[in-house]
Amino acid sequence: MKLRTLLSATVALGLATSAAMAMDKTGWPESFTVGTASQGGTYFVYGSGFAGIIAEDLGISGGGEITGGPMQNMALVHTGEAAFGMTTMGPANESLNGTNPIAPGLKMDKACAMFPMYQTPFNVTALTSSGIKSISDIPAGSKIGFGPAGSTSDTYFPSMLESLGVDFERRNGSWNDLGSQLQDGLLDAIAFAAGVPTAAVSQLEAQTEVNFVEFTEEEQSKIQEGFPVANFVVPNGTYASQPGDLRSVSMWNFAIANCDLPESFVYEATKAIMGDHERMLKVHKAAKTTVPENWDKNTVLSWHPGAAKWFNENGASIDAANIYGN
């Protein structure tokens, strides 16, 4: 049985290698990077995972790169410093309009949609010992961690909390660092915006008792009045100590590709990711919604021609006017 399994694996690897060698790689890069975010967040795990899948299937070297998150990824992909990246619809829209704080006035229109990822919910986490169980419980002047500077959380969560009347001191850092600061009493709460389950939150609840602070329905409505978000529920069981479903708001995340990359390269890369959903689920549970039918969640970016070709071959109806170069 072991010999049969070994032979099957060898044959499968040989077939994958042969398929990669048979591809027309004219104009393809020799290697690539995927702009992710800080360690401890979903972007780093998800992005490094999808980089590995593309590298394996296409037979070229590639990997995830630690970055400042969606805003920086838009800049890196726009300039071509990173072939691929990950962003949310809010930062993507700001970047297209020239209001990305990394390069104010520059319209980053060379970052194209590649495939849908997942929704990023916004939630606050505090130590149980803090007594913070709701947004209204957050004391004035609280020190709140918002993730890396330029991340989706840092870009939107402070303004969201301000709209709810929360007075706070803003702190930035990687999710892992902020988790340590929370445990050391240097922070009162962390405002997370990341795909769930978030590794840093899972690690935090394994080490100490935490409160998951949800929004009230009124707070959800208030936030939706001023921000490009939708209601979201973090399902019970996402985290081990979660008391039940958690009300939240969320933004969609999309993988992006430099618009000038060869169509055939991005087509094959998209096929590698979207063609085997089970493999992406092994990368991260957030990939549950990385499925073809969510192509229409891109409401901002032009599609890369290679990605659009794959999606239109697999049930999408992406209008030619929304494809880069048309």
How would you name each of these model-derived features?
Residues M1-P29, G325-N326:
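Short, low-complexity disordered leader/linker segments with a strong preference
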Residues M23-E94:
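N-terminal (or domain-start) structured segment
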Residues P29, G41, G59, G69-Q72, ...:
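Extracytoplasmic
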Residues P29-E30, D177, D184, A194, ...:
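An extracytoplasmic/periplasmic, membrane-proximal ligand-sensing/linker region
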Residues S31-D57, S61-G62, T120-D184, E293, ...:
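Bilobed "Venus flytrap"/periplasmic-binding protein-like clamshell domains
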Residues M89-P91, G98-P104, S130, V166-L261:
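Pocket-lining segment of extracytoplasmic ligand-binding domains
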Residues N93-T99, K110-P116:
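Short beta-strand-centered segments that line the small-molecule binding cleft or hinge
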Residues A140-F157, P228-T299:
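Ligand-binding clefts/hinges and TM-proximal coupling segments of bilobed small-molecule sensing domains
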